[in-house]
Regions:
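Conserved beta-strand segments of alpha/beta enzyme cores
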Residues: 84-87, 149, 180-182
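Residues that mark the start of a beta-strand
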Residues: 122-124, 149, 286
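HTH-adjacent hinge/linker in prokaryotic transcriptional regulators
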Residues: 8, 44-124, 138-145, 158-163
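Conserved phosphate- and dinucleotide-binding cores of soluble alpha/beta proteins
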Residues: 2-18, 22-31, 36, 41, ...
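Glycine-rich beta-strand-to-loop/alpha-helix junction loops that act as flexible
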Residues: 89-90, 126-132, 292, 316
Length: 326
């Protein structure tokens, strides 16, 4: 009579090791002692159980938290766009007109939590002004994280009575993150000769240089439309917007416009911008893009296609829209 195959006993041992590891919570060293095998053998038994399909791991979102936790969408966004991390904000009720900081409270809280987790004390953090970054600064918690300096990435001075929030962001981040502030005392756009003159100014040139080499950059995104912050703040008019759109512009970061593939749109306006160039944004290893609202969908998709962000914080509607695109 033929000797019985050793395979069933091998599987029994693998199943036993997997049960002790996944269900009973034992370490590999404890499993090795329990089964009378070496620690490497215990590890191989657990791996064999997984390889043979004896282990099924299921991550379950509690039913009462399904409106606030979106792990599946986050994972798919990371895989689809090659992101370091995606955070989909919960369904907290935000009260406020579109474009106002209150309308970004949920993504602001989520982005603040992500930022505090990613910051290290030696980092220089750059930001672009806007309601999204105002919401982030508002949501920062004292004593959780720190960085070396906070630098303004785009000019904010304007003749219009428009509140950019740049001073609030600088002051709040400096206080909460115990950081040095580096202001950019310049307008967002100026004529080319003025821009050239400003670049020779030691304060402005040092600020732009610090921004270009920031370890962390956090920014909202603007649409190339009258729904954008730049139009609302009178930095652009309809004629300028029409020209940008005719050249393929779909969105902007720091006043610098890009097309549907996230590539810079080279116009006369680009020569007038006083802000960190998009190539420096793309080169930064920790870029956090905040997106919320239907008006930002196409610009967000373009920025992700162009690898202008490594980390994304968005609302669930934006996440689902992005995942529906091909």
């Amino acid at each position: 009579m033929a000797a019985p195959s050793a395979a069933p006993d091998d599987l029994r041992l693998a199943l036993r090791a997997a049960t002790l590891y996944y269900l009973d919570g034992l370490t590999q060293a404890e499993i090795a002692s329990r089964l009378g095998v070496s620690r490497p053998t215990a590890g191989r038994l657990i791996a064999r159980a997984k390889a043979k399909g004896l282990v099924r791991i299921e991550v379950v979102v509690p039913p009462d938290m399904r409106d606030n936790l979106h792990a599946d969408e986050e994972r798919e966004l990371e895989q689809r766009f090659g992101l370091t991390e995606a955070v989909v904000a919960g369904s907290g009720i935000d009260v406020g007109a579109p474009g106002r900081p209150a309308a970004y409270a949920s993504v602001g809280r989520a982005a603040a939590a992500l930022l505090m987790r990613r910051l290290v004390a030696t980092d220089v953090m750059g930001f672009t002004w806007g309601p999204e970054t105002v919401a982030v600064a508002t949501a920062l918690s004292p004593g959780v994280a720190s960085c070396r300096a906070v630098v303004q990435l785009d000019g904010a001075m304007s003749t219009a009575a428009y509140q950019t929030g740049a001073e609030f962001i600088l002051g709040r981040c400096a206080d909460v993150l115990r950081a040095e502030t580096i202001r950019l005392p310049a307008p967002l756009y100026a004529d080319p000769s003025t821009v050239a003159s400003m670049r020779s100014d030691s304060v402005i040139s040092r600020t732009l240089e610090a921004g270009r080499h920031a370890n962390v950059m956090i920014f909202g995104i603007g649409a190339a439309s009258t729904a954008g912050t730049l139009f609302e703040g009178s930095y652009l008019d309809t004629r300028m917007l029409d020209e940008l759109v005719s050249l393929g512009a779909v969105g902007e970061i720091g006043g610098r416009f890009f097309d549907a593939d996230g590539e810079p749109v080279n116009t006369e306006l680009a020569q007038r911008a006083v802000s960190v160039p998009l190539e420096d944004v793309k080169a930064c290893q920790k870029t956090i893009l905040i997106a919320s609202g239907v008006a930002k969908h196409h610009a967000t998709l373009a920025a992700l296609r162009g690898k202008l962000a490594r980390l994304l914080v968005c609302d669930i509607d934006c996440a689902r829209w992005l995942l529906a695109q091909r």
